[in-house]
Amino acid sequence: MTIVVFATEYDAANVIFSILCRSPSEHLIFPIIVKYKPSNNVSFCLQTQKCKNSKRIDTVFVCHAEKLNLSHYIQTASPIKAEDVANSLNDKETESLYVDMILSQTGKEREDVEFKYMAYFHKSLIIKYLTGKFLLPTSPFWFLSTYGQTEGMLLLTMFYYLFEEQKSTITTTKNYVQCFTENTGNMVFTYSSMSEFINITLKSKFRKLFADFSTYARQKNLRDKEEFKHLDTQINLFRKSSHLTNTFRVHYIYIAYNTALETTKFVNYCNLTSYDSNLPIGQQCQRNLHILGNSLHENLLCIMKQYFNADCYFKTYIDIKRLKNPNLNVTEYEYALVSKKKTIQALTSEQITRAIAKCNKNGEGLFSPVKPGLQGLLEISASDRYVQIQDKRIYRRQHLHKDYHRPFPVFRVQLLHKNIFCFGNSEDWYENMGFNRILQYLPDEYISDEALTRAIWLQDTHFLCDDVEKQFYTTRHEIFNERIPVTNYIGDLDLPLQDTATITEETFFSMCRLIRLTLINAWKKIFPSIDTDTHPIFFFKTQCDTTNDTLDYTEDPTEIKQFCVCRKKIGLRISIPLPNGTAIAGGEPLKQLSKILNHVMCLDQELSQILNSITFPGECFDIGIYHTGHCIRIGYMYKTDMDKGKMLHGRLTPIFIVPEGYRNSCKTFIQMQMDLNNLLHHGTKKAPIEELIYNITDKGCPKENLSFMDLKSRQLWNKVNIATETLITKYLNTHGFNNNATSADDSLLSFIRLIGWPIIKTQLITHYETRIAQQFSQVTFIKIDSKNLQIKKTQFGRVSDFSCLNRQHRGNRDNVLVYIQLKADGNRLILILWSTCFATKCQSNSKQVHCSIALEQLKN
């Protein structure tokens, strides 16, 4: 059946209704595009609002071909009178289009009545059906803005999109047209009438290309499907073989598609699959199959495979700078944990300031003064400056206490009404924490990590007070001092929880064991001398906050027993001692180390599965704690929150993950986890420091605040542009104009007059009506800045602005400002012509862009 897509200049629904009722008005039917097929009938169709199975048009009435004589109207490009359509209507075929809809809506049975009467008495139903199902454009503007403004683009896109029932969008079909032919014909002006419009569509030379273009477009579509199927396969192969977190997985997919479909590659692919006149129509789009997916391997996948494989990651990306020397002369804390001697001092901020001022005064002429306050105290603690008096060394820190021979820790302690700072080099840690009694009743045999953790009963307290000695063992925080070497890596690990997460004891301990396995393997690559079976990693978990707990504690044997009832996050503190004799200098290496550990936690398949099931893993290790003066809560200590009624809560309780080598002596491991010097950044060790790590770099993301995925994203989107002035000079030289300009201003004006303006003017003459184009016959340019110029028209020796380029306003005055903007895009310039009009209809002086022209790409 011959199919005609038509339009009207009046409300199409009412025009169609009048034809169905055989009472046609004087309105006209305009055949826009026709698909011929030998038949006794002609089907008149409109585009539907929804397209099921890519069927984008549907019939609204059917005519007898012989009565209508459609070929006469097509050959003469004439509209069809509604009366002629009504007289040639095929009642039987047309009735079948509407009768079921009418009967289903009214609930009546079929009556023996002519269709025209049935239609007449159901006008509202038919009008509602037509307006609800079809698009009803009444001017050429809609077709031009939808399908394209040039003859070839309009017709080829419309024919393929409407008639071929292919799964291609309008945008995709337009891309196919550009690949099929470089010449898409003349511009069709948007202000043409419907009669002028069908004169173009029914007489166009592009009608001869419908069959070839449809064949090419189907082949291009198949090639695109095959290409993207292969690309998807390549992306999924890596995604399934690696163990990315959910967040990283999303980032990876975006980066992969953007890498494969980067502008240059996509343009090359389009050129490769463009229509080749030297090949038969059936052999188009067959060259270099899978080019996009194959390019992804070289540009991204081989890099990702190295970065997301633990062995390759450490070999290729991790660079560690070490200094080995038996005479390094650097030292960590000197801190005794079993001592009856009281050297701990507790001072407020004001008292510290006075103490530092006194220290500066006593050392005047001997030591350089330090800044009063906490920073000064930290500097004194780390300072090894001394004076020799009668063969005896007097250190600066001994002005604070005579027994402070080596660096001492500084703690922040929360009291009821204030913070206080404590420092010293000895305390009776085990006795005051009650650890001696705990160790006394511990079982000797190892049963399981879970049983061992449950067996520890710490002495507890609930209330905040102003007693320094009590609070020293409940709310203590260590203050980081980057001047002192780090002997333990202390990690603050927060795992944000999913809303539906259920954390059983088995899940939690499995997660901790896998975290230990992942981190100890990473530790082995950084410190090859360690024994992974015996090297400890100490875990602490913030106690669950049950103040807002709405759980039902009624016994239910079928209910899953939760080990953790936290709702927002799981807070873990992880301490990994460095090997004896090794230390890290400063906070920067620790930040990089935290990023590395963040990354390696995503590389283990089992760990990733658990983390993805209950948490939102990603950048979980906090890197903000490694700055001088920042503090972190020590294991076994409580949180304080004045809003919770001065109560202590959220204690860091020990989770014992015993390594294989300590299963036969688990009490020794527990003693190690109770040793405060294993829980402090700068804890005291037995062996002197002979190896110092002063720099750790992840070459994949050397910047502290960027992950590997973030860096890849920035590299994709942050295109490096050449300076506009440089591009202007290059264009002048390329086009054979000697740039003798003495300044950048002269170069810019020369470029616009000689190169830029002729191109813009040609665009205006070709695509704009005469009223607009004539305004630009004589112009001059005024430089605004290095990238913007204003255009003024010159007439009879006078300079003036322009009348509106968008509309003909009442009283159309010359008060519109017109500009040219230059924008660098890689190795080329884009020229943008824009204006501002004061009229309300033109958005009251807002920027209106009229054309944007990309100049040719310059060679490097």
UniProtKB/Swiss-Prot annotation:
GO terms for biological process: bidirectional double-stranded viral DNA replication; DNA replication. Coiled coil: none annotated. One of its GO terms (molecular function) is DNA-directed RNA polymerase activity. It holds the Pfam family Herpes_UL52. Its EC number is 2.7.7.-. Keywords: DNA replication, Host nucleus, Metal-binding, Transferase, Zinc, Zinc-finger. Essential component of the helicase/primase complex. Unwinds the DNA at the replication forks and generates single-stranded DNA for both leading and lagging strand synthesis. The primase initiates primer synthesis and thereby produces large amount of short RNA primers on the lagging strand that the polymerase elongates using dNTPs. This is DNA primase. It comes from Human herpesvirus 6A (strain Uganda-1102). The gene is U43.
